[in-house]
C-alpha cells in the first residue's frame, strides 16, 4: 500500500511522527506499505528547524510543494495545482491528511477528484462557528474522507449527527499522547525556566492562538483579567509576535505575565 501523508504546518508533524514510526515498523515486519511525506510549504520554512525532526525521531519531508501564500485563495489554488502534479508523479492508494488546515482540505479535494481514498486524522472536530475558517475546512474534509480517525467520543457523535457512516469512523484516541509518551524520558527542563525562577507546579502555562478570540478585544481583556484575579502564580505565555503586539495595544500587562 502506498500512503501519501500531508503536513501543512509545523504542529502537524507532532501527530504525524507516531504514524511514520508505525509505518516503518510495519514495513520492517514484512508489511507491504510505504509512506511519502509531503509538506505543502517551503524547505526554507524557518519553523522547521532540523532539531524538530530529530526530537520527533522522524524523517524530513520527501517533497516540499513550496506553496506559502498568506492569501487563502492563492494558497488554496497553489496547493490544488501542486499536489495534483505530485500525485501524477508519485501515485498513492491513500492520502492521509491531519487536522483542519487549508492544506488539509485542499489535498483532500485533489485526492478525491483523482479517485484516491482519503484518511482524516483528528476527524470530527467541531467549533460550531462557521465564521472560523477551520470549521469549514474540517467539515469539507470529513465529508470527503473514507476513513475518519477520531480523538474522542464527542468527535464520533459529531460525525454521527452529520450522517457519516459509522463503518467509516474509527476511534483511535489522541495521537499527541503517543508523541508525549515517546519523548517523555527525553524531556528536559527548559533553561528559560531557571532564568525566570519558575518552580515545579508553581506556574501556569497559557497558550493563545485563536484568531476569532484575538480579534475580540472585550473577550481578550476579560480572559486576562479573570486569570490574573484568580491566581497569584506567574504565567508563562509563549506567544506569537502578533499576539504580543495585540496585548500591548490593549494595555494588558502584569509583572506575573
PLM region spans:
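Short N-terminal binding/cap micro-motifs at the start of the first secondary-structure element
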Residues: 12-16, 45-47
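Donor-nucleotide binding loops and adjacent catalytic segments primarily
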Residues: 50-53, 188-257
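A generic structural motif
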Residues: 25-36, 231-235
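Conserved nucleotide-sugar phosphate-binding/catalytic loop shared by glycosyltransferases and other
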Residues: 31-75
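A nucleotide-sugar donor-handling region in carbohydrate enzymes
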Residues: 42-43, 47, 66, 144-218
Amino acid at each position: 500500500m502506498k500512503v501519501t501523508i500531508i503536513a501543512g504546518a509545523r504542529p502537524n508533524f507532532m501527530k504525524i511522527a507516531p504514524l511514520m514510526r508505525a509505518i516503518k515498523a510495519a514495513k520492517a515486519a514484512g508489511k507491504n506499505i510505504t509512506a511519502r511525506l509531503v509538506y505543502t510549504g517551503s524547505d526554507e520554512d524557518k519553523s522547521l528547524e532540523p532539531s524538530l525532526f530529530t526530537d520527533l525521531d522522524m524523517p524530513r519531508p520527501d517533497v516540499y510543494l513550496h506553496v506559502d501564500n498568506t492569501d487563502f485563495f492563492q494558497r488554496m489554488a497553489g496547493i490544488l495545482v501542486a499536489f495534483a502534479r505530485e500525485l501524477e508523479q508519485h501515485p498513492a492508494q491513500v492520502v492521509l491528511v491531519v487536522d483542519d488546515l487549508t492544506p488539509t482540505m485542499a489535498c483532500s479535494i485533489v485526492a478525491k477528484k483523482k479517485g484516491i481514498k482519503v484518511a482524516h486524522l483528528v476527524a470530527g472536530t467541531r467549533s460550531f462557528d462557521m465564521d472560523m475558517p477551520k470549521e469549514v475546512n474540517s467539515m469539507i474534509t470529513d465529508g470527503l474522507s473514507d476513513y475518519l480517525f477520531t480523538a474522542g467520543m464527542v468527535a464520533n457523535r459529531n460525525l454521527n449527527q452529520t450522517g457519516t457512516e459509522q463503518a467509516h469512523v474509527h476511534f483511535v484516541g489522541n495521537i499527541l499522547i503517543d508523541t508525549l509518551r515517546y519523548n517523555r524520558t527525553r524531556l528536559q527542563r527548559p533553561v528559560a525556566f531557571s532564568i525566570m525562577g519558575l518552580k515545579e507546579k508553581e506556574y501556569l502555562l497559557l497558550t493563545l492562538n485563536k484568531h476569532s478570540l484575538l480579534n475580540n478585544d472585550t473577550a481578550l481583556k476579560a480572559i486576562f483579567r479573570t486569570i490574573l484575579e484568580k491566581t497569584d502564580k506567574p504565567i508563562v505565555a509563549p506567544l506569537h509576535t502578533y499576539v504580543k503586539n495585540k496585548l500591548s495595544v490593549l494595555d494588558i500587562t502584569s509583572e506575573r505575565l
